[in-house]
UniProtKB/Swiss-Prot annotation:
It comes from Eremothecium gossypii (strain ATCC 10895 / CBS 109.51 / FGSC 9923 / NRRL Y-1056). The keyword Cell membrane does not apply. Component of the RNA polymerase II (Pol II) complex consisting of 12 subunits. One of its GO terms (biological process) is transcription initiation at RNA polymerase II promoter. The C-terminal domain (CTD) serves as a platform for assembly of factors that regulate transcription initiation, elongation, termination and mRNA processing. Signal peptide: none annotated. It is found in: Nucleus. Zn(2+) 1 binds at C67, C70, C77, H80. GO terms for cellular component: mitochondrion; RNA polymerase II, core complex. Residues 1546-1730 have a biased composition (Low complexity). Belongs to the RNA polymerase beta' chain family. The keyword Heme does not apply. This is DNA-directed RNA polymerase II subunit RPB1.
Length: 1745
């Protein structure tokens, strides 16, 4: 074999996998050796035997021998197959049932299909495209055909017959018996032994011959494939022998070897095979041969599958079953799941974790020993050669060091053993495997990884000692604690992987979780406890401590804030110092009960511009709650700032707490005497009540509640009293604890503990329960031997009246242990259950992704949703918002929204508008306003129709309220001044904005419809918030501000759209599976409550996902029509009409008497009935008298039940008569009789009357009695066993338009019969609901089924108090219903879909699926996730769903000509530097190197701004153009950065570009009052948004800007295409525009300085190529062989001492070079030494380029 030279070229990927069966010819062709001997070694026991099982041609298994086929050694030879020629064909065990089915389809004589196109059904079957389904359809038709027809009736003329070429033979019925098939042939009717059918084993040989005769057409009809799977290949004639590397033997010593199970089994097969051959040659009798044939069959079968039902397992000598090939593949530890889907990996570490509050949120402390073991391969470039050389010198044992050097030819130098490690001269392009160092991104994970937040990217911080350290706040998403948990760390091994980690998985980016659109991290533990203590009223801090604390505020500006209290001594409040950690521009308000703007109780929360105004900061504010501080900061300022906020808060609070102290002791659980008395009283009272109830029960005075038995009602009362007692006791304990109490402090801060904990510690532990009931009686009617029999007292049934503080009595302790044990078992069972549910969900949804056309599809390309989540939004960007058009009365609505310029009541106050007086009576304007108001009224009706209960808080993108608040703050809105807004501006502005909000782009009808649906709700919100009246009267926005608000809404909206490539399926599966893990397994919340029992929690989720046909608790919720719903009596009527009442349920007793005379009776009680009935006899009765039987069936009915069900005797009697017609003679007593009796006699039929019949009459009557009781329905609907009336509140709008609650009666049933109940008069068929979504689907169709399914999934998750965003559950139910039937999330549901075989086999039934795939010759196109994981390829998902291409033509076409230089140039994250400074030398922005090619580039710091600007703190970050986080919130698209003068909002900002559609003379930021804008400035040029001479940052002394720079020109139009405010929805942005180039993410064809022909601008500027940082085709001195060496600069060489970025003597002639310039650092990717020289020289020669 040739030794290929090392190559870095990527390997070809596998595009598709074709399954099939091996034909005998192929097996022989592949084989390199025919195996004939069962021995492995030859006689010497030293070398492998030729022709034996370890034939040397199969591959070497010994270090001493080379492989005879390929000549490689043991490590390089992959092994080669051999083959065994079988003496007789045998069945392949995997296909035996398929072989049987094929035998049933074809004639067993001539091999022809038994049916063909002449049969109508068959014609349909053959049209099925999918081979497996076609085979099943053909088989189900053919299996009934028992003869091979020679001719069939013609279609045109049924009397004529057409020949079809059959042979006319009868077909056997075939049955599988063990490993053989048995055929039974029915004889002809007129044959003499017709009743003795012929029965014999059909041999494999026979079947093989038949299958060989199957024609190609027939084989295709049977779902086979001529090229890859013929039916006869399912039988084995030649057996492939796997090479030894598949079945390696283990050697004990030189002579002894232990063979692998497969080798052992192959030996058995060979022995049996030789045996059969010998018998054949010897001509032994048939039955002897058959015997040994079946042995061969057995060995071949167990070699492949040793778990065959009904077959003995093949065992080794020791009795251990052999591990067959099937066992190697299947199951969790098997090949597929254990070695292909999941492997062990390199570059990972695992150790115990501990907390460290001094680390940043996204850091991880890595032990030095681990940092020295794990490495990262870094390629040597001019920028890092010095650093890497130093690391190589340090060697492998000193921490920042290196372990290996890899040369460009692939050789590894191990620095542990290299003698001359110190003097290795590194060359460009080599790799150094260096230790991991601070700030490397690594992936950190804790199992079980239930959601994506269980694997996040952290920054390394190398630390001493041996545990991983992490910030406390990041433990909640990992669900970690420090009681011994271990975590794993993985080091990425390529730049691309590092980029993905830092840009997609970084902890800050996961703060807001898409699972429930709220943060998944918050302040926890001591910091949370401390933050509450610190922000209480009257917490003051003195000067010395304040000064210390200010040092703990990481970005403190050096200004000591004014103290809150000046005299007698200066004091600062805790709120004040905490505010210093909160970034400015943050607004938050939350009102709790009783909060006003003065907040006397200091509850609620108000933060304005980052200052805490009032409110104690607790879990509600800084916990992981929706709309809390964490959420707002992430949304407003970006993830990075939010991550810093965590650190800031922790540092400040922990320092304060350290000095203030907090501890808890046993004393905190002790209540005072008065409280203890209250507690004792409460418990005594409860016990007294229980005693009373017990007495009542014993005296039989209790009445059962409806739907409950007496005993249930009794238990219910007792449990209620006892729980009341515990709560009351707990409440008094809690109320009487002082606020200083440490337990109470923790509970109220939310850091630990709850009300129940206080109650149990101090007051009373309460009732213990097992399975939701009180402790049950064990032996002899007692719970424990310490109690007397039948003791129902609280003590005996497990009520613990002591508190933990007091201590439990032995009995109490025992009961408490019982309750606790149940909890433990529950948890253990739940873990396994939910783990499996999670796995099924993930496997069912794993391949669902948002595609580039906005649709959500699976790997087959089937559309699951037209728009993800039906609105195309990313769940993380969504917040709950109130749609104000829904609530409130009509009058209030009109007051809030209507403007009528002609009607003084609804006119605008003229003082509000500058144009206030001019607009009065303007009809044209009024029309505009009327249209707006009409639309709002329409919205109101529309929304009220959808949200029938008037709910108006819905999760929507873009928090408009906050944007308006930020605008008012930023632009310092003065609410006393009139605004310069005009009404047209508002109405048209909002209208224009709605048209620009595109989720989907495209003109086709379906896209338009989806687009409309996606934004309908958001537009309603938008119109309700930005209605003209509100904008002018409520918010008082100016024209400038209003435009800023609109632009901001648009930018944030576009940023909220979900990214194509997002794997939303897995996200949904995790979002549902993770809460399920937290759920309680068996919910006993309804312990005895008088209502329907409902399965919930995990068991219910299991039912839903399995689409279980028979649920545990099917139930209907029946809503009634208006007139019935409010009237209890009418509702009762319907209840009795629905509740299924059988005769049995009203019968007390039934008896059979011998009462010979029909007209009198032996039963005294019944004489009255007889007299009444026979006093008036009609002829019919008289006629039947003589035929009546002497046997009498007598039923006694239950009067209570009868009145309850509202039945009369007449109704019951008539019903019986109706059922049995004339066969039964029935009479009954009056309704008011003492006992309600029904008498029935059989009326005999004189024709059939004989002695025998007469003797059996009483038996017959017994049968009649059973039938009667069971099957006679007196009233109600079948299957509805019980109906309970419940009173629910219904929210409906009143006359005034306000929502109010109306109580209504609703029926809850046990049992479901939807179609019947719907048609009961009085039932409201539009609102009826059942939890059996299968019924809903059957009655109302799949769409209704989907809605019901969603509601059920939602209820399960909500029952536990969790919230999961709509889109996740919607995606799951859409997948389950997308095929038009309910597809379960089990192996029978989604795993039977038409996805690739590799993907299906990685779930369950691995081997069976692969067999099936082989027989049907399936083709897997490898588009799913699992397929690519198995093949070890990058799956086409996420960052793998596209390729990045370089446009070679443009590289040549657009040569950079001159250099444009600006005061500030922002180079952003694209790999295209937009022709800014062709050589990228003098860029004024330091781009952080790790973010170079990232679409989410972090802002660079531009020192033109850093040197002053109008910023408060100096320095501002600008985000990249492509960054959706626009500099994490400081761009013009982000509200809340400082004030107008901040560069983020002013024309000095490079982020504003005149070409940007949102920049116009009317644009809010273009205002003559803007402090940094001066039109009088002589060199002011409106085309240069980023140049302003009045800016203090422009000064000749500014190091980064020099007017003498040859490239400087005051009029230079420094157009910067990187403007982040450029918006793709701008009219000029159109993919069809000829000048549009998708490679430049933010370039706009309308740019004045852009012209496709202009050579000076190129979207893919050639001057930058990521692979060669210093490559520029225009540089004459460039030579491809030396990327960084330039002959024009003789003194420059990488090793030259003058090459030192810090050396001031380096290139001092470059006018723009300044040794102090912070950007000039080898870290900066835009720094290139060779260019500096080249450019300088070229400038000197040509003046400019």
């Amino acid at each position: 074999m040739v030794d290929f030279p090392y190559s870095s070229a990527p390997l070809r990927t596998i595009k598709e996998v074709q399954f099939g069966l091996f034909s005998p010819e192929e097996v022989r062709a592949i084989s390199v050796a025919k195996i004939e001997f069962p021995e492995t070694m030859d006689e010497t026991q030293m070398r492998a035997k030729v022709g034996g099982l370890n034939d040397p041609r199969l591959g070497s298994i010994d270090r001493n021998f080379k492989c005879q086929t390929c000549g490689e050694g043991m490590n390089d030879c992959p092994g080669h197959f051999g083959h065994i020629e079988l003496a007789k064909p045998v069945f392949h065990i995997g296909f035996i049932s398929k072989i049987k089915k094929v035998c049933e389809c074809v004639c067993m004589h001539c091999g022809k299909l038994l049916l063909d196109e002449y049969n109508e059904l068959m014609r349909q079957a053959i049209k099925i495209k999918d081979p497996k389904r076609r085979f099943n359809a053909v088989w189900s038709l053919c299996k009934a055909k028992m003869v091979c027809d020679t001719e069939v009736p013609s279609e045109d003329d049924p009397s004529k017959y057409i020949s079809r070429g059959g042979c006319g033979n009868a077909q056997p019925s075939i049955r599988k018996d063990g490993l053989s098939l048995v055929g039974t042939w029915k004889k002809d009717k007129n044959a003499e032994d017709a009743d003795q059918p012929e029965k014999r084993i059909i041999s494999a040989e026979e079947i093989l011959n038949v299958f060989k005769h199957i024609s190609p057409e027939d084989s295709w009809r049977l779902g086979f494939n001529e090229d890859f799977s013929r039916p006869e290949w399912m039988l084995l004639t030649v057996l492939p022998v796997p090479p030894p590397p598949v079945r390696p033997s283990i050697s004990f010593n030189e002579s002894q070897r232990g063979e692998d199970d497969l080798t052992y089994k192959l030996g058995d097969i060979l022995k049996a095979n030789i045996n059969v051959q010998r018998l054949e040659i010897n001509g032994s009798p048939q039955h002897v041969i058959q015997e040994s044939e079946s042995l061969l069959q057995f060995h071949v079968a167990t070699y492949m599958d040793n778990d065959i039902a009904g077959q003995p397992q093949a065992v080794q000598k020791s009795g251990r079953p052999i591990k067959s090939i099937r066992a190697r593949l299947k199951g969790k530890e098997g090949r597929i799941r254990g070695n292909l889907m999941g492997k062990r990996v390199d570059f990972s570490a695992r150790t115990v974790i501990s907390g460290d509050p001094n680390l940043d949120l996204d850091q991880v402390g890595v032990p030095k020993s681990i940092a020295k073991t794990l490495t990262y391969p870094e390629v040597v470039t001019p920028y890092n050669i010095d650093r890497l050389t130093q690391l190589v010198r340090n060697g492998p044992n000193e921490h920042p060091g290196a372990k290996y050097v890899i040369r460009d030819n692939g050789d590894r130098i191990d620095l542990r053993y290299s003698k001359r490690a110190g003097d290795i001269q590194l060359q460009y392009g080599w790799k150094v495997e260096r230790h991991i160092m601070d700030d490397d991104p690594v992936l950190f994970n804790r199992q079980p990884s239930l959601h994506k937040m269980s694997m996040m990217a952290h920054r390394v911080k190398v630390m001493p000692y041996s545990t991983f350290r992490l910030n406390l706040s990041v433990t909640s998403p990992y669900n970690a604690d420090f009681d011994g948990d271990e975590m794993n760390l993985h080091v990425p091994q390529s730049e691309e992987t590092r980029a993905e980690l830092s840009q997609l998985c970084a902890v800050p980016l996961q703060i807001v979780s898409p699972q429930s659109n709220k943060p998944c991290m918050g302040i926890v533990q001591d910091t949370l406890c401390g933050i509450r203590k610190m922000t209480l009223r009257d917490t003051f801090i003195e000067l010395d401590q304040v000064l210390n604390m200010l040092y703990w505020i990481p970005d403190w500006d050096g200004v000591i804030p004014t103290p809150t209290i000046l005299k007698p001594k200066p004091l600062w409040s805790g709120k004040q110092l905490l505010s210093m950690a909160i970034p400015s521009g943050i607004h938050l308000q939350r009102f709790d009960e009783g909060t006003t703007y003065l907040s006397p109780k200091d509850n609620g929360m108000l933060i304005i511009d980052g200052q805490i105004i009032f409110g104690v900061v607790d879990k509600k504010t800084v916990g992981s709650s929706s709309g809390g501080l964490i959420h707002v900061v992430t949304r407003e300022k970006g993830p990075e700032v939010c991550a810093k906020l965590f650190g800031n808060i922790q540092k400040v609070v922990n320092y304060w707490l350290l000095h203030n102290g907090f501890s808890i002791g046993i004393g905190d659980t002790i209540a005072d005497e008065k409280t203890m008395r209250e507690i004792t009283d409460a418990i005594a009272l409860a016990k007294k009540k229980v005693e009373e109830v017990t007495k009542e029960a014993q005296a039989n005075l209790l009445t059962a509640k409806h739907g409950m038995t007496l005993r249930e009602s009794f238990e219910d009362n007792v449990v209620r009293y006892l729980n009341e007692a515990r709560d009351k006791a707990g409440r008094s304990a809690e109320v009487n604890l002082k606020d200083l109490n440490n337990v109470k402090q923790m509970v109220s801060a939310g850091s630990k503990g709850s009300f129940i904990n206080i109650a149990q510690m101090s007051a009373c532990v309460g009732q213990q329960s097992v399975e939701g009931k009180r402790i049950a009686f064990g032996f002899a009617d007692r719970t424990l031997p310490h109690f007397s029999k039948d003791d129902y007292s609280p003590e005996s049934k497990g009520f613990v009246e002591n508190s933990y503080l007091r201590g439990l009595t032995p009995q109490e302790f025992f009961f408490h242990a019982m309750g606790g044990r149940e909890g433990l078992i529950d948890t253990a069972v739940k873990t396994a259950e939910t783990g499996y549910i999670q796995r099924r969900l993930v496997k069912a949804l794993e391949d669902i992704m948002v595609h580039y056309d906005g649709t959500t599809r699976n790997s087959l390309g089937n559309i699951i949703q037209f728009v993800y989540g039906e609105d195309g939004m990313d769940a993380a960007h969504i917040e709950k918002q109130s749609i104000d058009t829904i609530p409130g009365s009509d009058l209030a609505f009109e007051k809030r929204y209507r403007i009528d310029l002609l009607n003084p009541n609804y006119a605008l106050d003229p003082n509000l508008l500058e144009s206030g007086t001019e607009i009065v009576g303007d009809l044209k304007l009024q029309n505009l306003l009327d249209e707006e108001y009409k639309q709002l009224v329409q919205d109101r009706h529309f929304l009220r129709k959808i949200f029938m209960d008037g709910e108006h808080n819905w999760p929507l993108p873009v928090n408009i309220r906050r944007i308006i608040q930020n605008a008012q703050q930023t632009f310092r809105i003065d609410s006393t001044k009139p605004t310069d807004l005009s009404i047209q501006d508002v109405v048209q502005g909002v209208r224009g904005l709605q048209e620009r909000l595109l989720v989907l782009r495209g003109k086709s009808q379906i896209l338009q419809e989806a687009q409309e649906n996606a934004i309908t709700l958001f537009c309603c919100l938008l119109r309700s918030r930005l209605a003209t009246r509100r904008v002018i009267t409520e918010y008082r926005l100016t024209k400038q501000t209003f435009e800023w608000v609109l632009n901001n809404i648009e930018a944030q909206f576009l940023r909220s759209i979900v990214h194509p490539g997002e794997m939303v399926g897995v996200l949904a599966a995790q979002s549902i599976g993770e809460p399920a893990t937290q759920m309680t397994l068996n919910t006993f919340h309804f312990a005895g409550v008088a209502s329907k029992k409902v399965t919930s929690g995990v068991p219910r989720l299991k039912e839903i996902l399995n689409v279980a046909k028979n649920m545990k608790t099917p139930s209907l919720t029946v809503y009634l029509e208006e007139s019935y719903a409010t009237d209890q009596e009418k509702a009762k009527l319907i209840r009795s009409a629905i509740e299924h009442t059988t005769l049995k349920s009203v019968t007390v007793a039934s008896e059979i008497y011998y009462d010979p005379d029909p007209s009198s009776t032996v039963i005294e009680e019944d004489e009255e009935i007889i007299q009444l009935h026979f006093s008036l006899m009609d002829e019919e009765t008289e006629a039947s008298l003589k035929h009546q039987s002497p046997w009498l069936l007598r039923l006694e009915l239950d009067r209570v039940a009868m009145t309850d069900k509202d039945l009369t005797m007449g109704q019951v009697g008539e019903k019986i008569k109706e059922t049995f017609k004339n066969d039964l003679f029935v009479i009954w007593s009056e309704d008011n009789a003492e006992k309600l009796i029904i008498r029935c006699r059989v009326v005999r039929d004189p024709k059939t009357l004989d002695a025998e019949a007469e003797a059996e009459e009483d038996h017959m009557l017994k049968k009649i009695e059973n039938t009667m009781l069971e099957s006679i329905t007196l009233r109600g609907v079948q299957d509805i066993t019980r109906v309970v009336m419940m009173k629910y509140d219904r929210k409906v709008p009143s006359e005034t338009g306000e929502y109010h609650k109306i109580p209504e009666w609703v029926l809850e049933t046990d049992g479901v019969n939807l179609s019947e109940v719907m048609s009961v008069p009085g039932v409201d068929p539009t609102r009826i609901y059942t939890n059996s979504f299968i019924d809903i689907m059957n009655v109302l169709g799949i769409e209704a089924g989907r809605a019901a399914l969603y509601k059920e999934v939602y209820n399960v998750i909500a029952s536990d108090g969790s919230y999961v965003n709509y889109r996740h559950m919607a995606l799951l139910v859409d997948v389950m219903t997308s095929q038009g039937f309910l597809m379960s999330v089990t192996r029978h549901g989604f795993n039977r879909a038409d996805t690739g075989a590799l993907m299906r086999c990685s779930f369950e039934e691995t081997v069976e699926i692969l067999f099936e795939a082989g027989a049907a010759a399936e083709l897997d196109d490898c588009s799913g996730v699992s397929e690519n994981v198995i093949l070890g390829q990058m799956a086409p998902i996420g960052t793998g769903s596209f390729d990045v291409m370089i446009d070679d033509e443009s590289l040549i076409k657009y040569m950079p000509e001159q250099k444009l230089s600006t005061a500030v140039e922002v180079n952003d994250g694209g790999a295209t530097p937009y022709n800014s400074d062709a050589g990228l030398v003098n860029t004024k922005v330091d781009i952080k190197d790790e973010l170079m090619f990232s679409p989410l580039v972090e802002a660079g710091t531009s020192d033109a701004i850093a040197s002053g600007g109008f910023t408060a703190y100096g320095g501002a970050d600008y985000g990249g153009a492509t960054s959706p986080f626009s500099g994490y919130g400081n761009g013009p698209t982000s509200p809340g950065f400082g004030d107008v003068s901040s560069p983020g909002f002013s024309p000095t900002s490079p982020a504003y570009s005149p070409t940007s559609p949102s920049y116009s003379p009317t644009s809010p930021s273009y205002s003559p009052t803007s402090p940094s804008y001066s039109p009088t400035s002589p060199s002011y040029s409106p085309t240069s948004p980023s140049y302003s001479p009045t800016s203090p940052s422009y000064s000749p002394t500014s190091p980064s800007y020099s007017p003498t720079s040859p490239s400087y020109s005051p009029t230079s139009p420094s157009y910067s295409p990187t403007s982040p405010s450029y918006s793709p929805t701008s009219p000029s942005y159109s993919p069809t525009s000829p000048s549009y180039s998708p490679t430049s993410p933010s370039y706009s064809p309308t740019s004045p300085s852009y012209s496709p022909t202009s050579p000076s601008y190129s979207p893919t500027s050639p001057s930058y190529s990521p692979t060669s940082p210093s490559y520029s085709p225009t540089s004459p001195s460039y030579s491809p062989t030396s990327p960084s060496y330039s002959p024009t600069s003789p003194s420059y060489s990488p090793t030259s001492p003058s090459y030192s970025p810090t050396s001031p003597s380096y290139s001092p002639t470059s006018p723009s070079y300044s040794p102090t310039s912070p950007q000039y650092s080898p870290r900066s990717p835009s720094y290139s030494p060779s260019f500096n020289n080249n450019d300088k020289e070229q400038k000197d020669e040509n003046g400019t380029h």
